Amino acid sequence: MQRFFVEPHQIDEAAHQIHIIGTDVNHISNVLRMKQGEEVWISDGGQKEYRCAIEAFSADEVLLHIIYAQEPDYELPSRIYLFQGLPKADKMELIIQKAVELGAYEIIPVETKRCVVKLDGKKAAKKVERWQQIAESAAKQSKRMLIPNVHQVLSFKEALKYAESMDIRLIPYELAKGMQETKEILAAIEQGQSIGIFIGPEGGFEEKEVEAAISEGAKPITLGKRILRTETAGLAILSGLMFQLEN
């Protein structure tokens, strides 16, 4: 069943109706070619989802009838922020898609010293807009209750500042101590804590960047004896955290 997201003001629980507006109108009417009576899931971007039936179509709105509402437990009990060093080509699209599926709360693109890709101004804004669309599509597909935000591109220094208030900050590093210490660090993470994960681009972080992150409170961890690509590393950590934190 198709899933869509709405703002709270689009929901009229007293009248048992939800008003779909914006680009989803065209998607429902002309792309999916849905008909009156067909059912969809609607998320309010918070804790509630609604099973609805299509009641009527107009040029700028799809009117839904609420069949029932529920408060499912789809989201992870911790907010996970993925600080991803800008990779080459279209790898960021894959990273965002899979990070959303695995429960990331926000994805922050980061420009580090070894990044080949450099984004600024209109180019950066256009990329972030595209990435946000990918996050929304992945959220719909994976039954997320919210659409994870794709932040504007930050410098590494700005990223460290942004992560200051997070309870846990992790940075995979080839010189980190053994797997046992990494397991202990991950096992100590509790539900409800906010978690920042720093992933380098191709070529990894410069040593000075790792030192700066550690001085700001980040904990170096290992991802094992094998070398992981930048598009794999963050997803490996997210997978482990998902299994550990999932209710």
What are these regions (language model features)?
Residues 73-171:
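RNA substrate-binding interface of SAM-dependent RNA methyltransferases
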Residues 40, 65, 71-83, 186-193:
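Mobile, glycine- and charge-enriched loop segments
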Residues 166-204, 209, 218-221:
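Active-site/ligand-binding-proximal alpha/beta "capping" segment
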Residues 124-128, 188, 239-240:
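Short, hinge-like loop/turn segments at secondary-structure boundaries
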Residues 1-71:
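N-terminal positively charged helical leader segments and presequences
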Residues 9, 69, 111-114, 225-226:
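Short, ordered loop/turn segments at secondary-structure junctions
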Residues 207-247:
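Structured adenosyl-cofactor binding patch, chiefly the S-adenosyl-L-methionine
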